[in-house]
């Protein structure tokens, strides 16, 4: 069988996804004891893993370095990539929200300034609402922007809401729910069809049996 290379994102999503691979019989022991390594071979299958930053997973898949990738839907929404989105894994569930200080008025007709790491998603959301806003792109922690008067509100991913609460912010609008997705390189889906669909089908059955 041909080798299948899977790109995973480091961090929180990785911890959600490793159990799914183990449940379909793919050994992930090296991943769980990785140290500083970034490339891993499953001991009992033809699968290898690479660990990269979340924003780079889709790029590795698009260019064929990885056959399969596991990435948050937020990355796919913000960055258009020429890949196939095959499966919603149902883990890593979060939501995009509009949040601000308690005195914020989302119904104000004044043009709002919105700080975010996700300008494309934010622009699309407000365009669909028919609302013209100024978007301020921030790379670091966006929670501070309303507190310092840089922006009226923020658009960010919320999981538990603890970070917002600690900074005195509240959610005003829930925009989109997101989760981890399995993506596939278009060429690999033709040349390694059997191997890739075997993983997809087993993963899908595991997800369905767990519901």
Swiss-Prot record:
Reported function: Catalyzes the condensation of ATP and 5-phosphoribose 1-diphosphate to form N'-(5'-phosphoribosyl)-ATP (PR-ATP). Has a crucial role in the pathway because the rate of histidine biosynthesis seems to be controlled primarily by regulation of HisG enzymatic activity.
Keywords recorded for this protein, A-Z: Amino-acid biosynthesis, ATP-binding, Cytoplasm, Glycosyltransferase, Histidine biosynthesis, Nucleotide-binding, Transferase
UniProt record, GO biological process: L-histidine biosynthetic process
Signal peptide range: none
Top-rank lineage group of the source organism: Bacteria
Biological pathway: Amino-acid biosynthesis; L-histidine biosynthesis; L-histidine from 5-phospho-alpha-D-ribose 1-diphosphate: step 1/9
EC code(s) of this entry: 2.4.2.17
Notes on the domains: Lacks the C-terminal regulatory region which is replaced by HisZ.
Family in the record: Belongs to the ATP phosphoribosyltransferase family. Short subfamily.
Reactions the enzyme catalyzes: 1-(5-phospho-beta-D-ribosyl)-ATP + diphosphate = 5-phospho-alpha-D-ribose 1-diphosphate + ATP
Magnesium recorded as keyword: no
Full protein name: ATP phosphoribosyltransferase
Gene Ontology molecular function, alphabetical: ATP binding; ATP phosphoribosyltransferase activity
Mitochondrion is among the record's keywords: no
